[in-house]
Amino acid sequence: MDLDGKVQPPSAQVGQQPLSPDAALHEPRLLQESGIAARVAVLAAPVLADLGLRLVRVKISGQNGTTVQIMAERPDGTMDVEACESVSEALSPVLDVEDPVKQAYHLEISSPGIDRPLVRLSDFERALGQEVRVELKTGLAGRKRFRGTIGPIEASSPIGGSKGALRLTRTDAKPEEETEVLLPLDDLHEARLVLTEDLIRQALRAAKAAREGDDGNNEEQDEEQEEPAPPRRGPGRFAPRHKTQNPEHNPAQNPISARAKPLVPAGVRTEFKKSKTGERGPAQKPHLASQAARKSDTGSSRSGHDMPRKPAPK
């Protein structure tokens, strides 16, 4: 990225050597939002970077009223529910103060999923050989939408512009059309992977490898935590009487609950939703909100003070 904030030609980024962790975290996107989504993206990007995550996309839809969807991931493409929750807790106060969305909305933090959008050069490198749908802004030879297999990024293409051009082997080409095309990334409007059986198999293999790696880490933790138990002794005659603690609530006595939760590999969708409904005004007390939530889940219920009392016998 140069001093003007523009993406450098891919010759300096693609096909040379892997990006450093800091460079991968701050790798610029090829696409930018517009309108309110752009304002949310400007606020969300630094918050995500502080958490070691990077922004994929911001989308605002009218689903369930108004939904603000923020896709995020780690530089390696992984994500987990805990990270989504951390983003929601860190980003919600910022959105409340800056107030980019005027009406009530639902905040949804999620990973990109299997059929993910491709928004960075590294996304195209990682998806090399996969099938993709591409939509251009102005089009190429009178055509805006293409579908085909992802090839390498051409840095020296005359139509590539400052971001290069994507070599695509078309699967939707007619007999009289060329199957090999170069799509300028400067004109890119949207690129999304096609959900195929091969893509699903790769995601399942990645999830299996992540689980096996997590099981190995848990076994090492179990071996480290296994220590000879001290001999049991009676409480004694004058020992204070207390309730026996449930070992399930003590992480030290229950190594299973102390295990680290596995990461969700790249391509597996995970999300965390947080609703922000009602008119803007003073915040409700937590216990009132929790009572309202319980009533909405279990139906209307009466407390002991609301139950009708029987008349006293005469």
Swiss-Prot record:
Residues 1-20, 152-176, 206-314 are annotated as: Disordered. Gene3D superfamilies: RimP-like superfamily, N-terminal. Residues 10-19, 247-256 have a biased composition (Polar residues). The keyword ATP-binding does not apply. One of its GO terms (biological process) is translation. Its main location: cytoplasm. Transmembrane segments: none annotated. InterPro entries: Ribosome_maturation_RimP (IPR003728), RimP_C (IPR028998), RimP_C_sf (IPR036847), RimP_N (IPR028989), RimP_N_sf (IPR035956). GO terms for cellular component: cytosol. NCBIfam families: PRK00092.2-5. Required for maturation of 30S ribosomal subunits. HAMAP family: RimP (MF_01077). This is Ribosome maturation factor RimP.
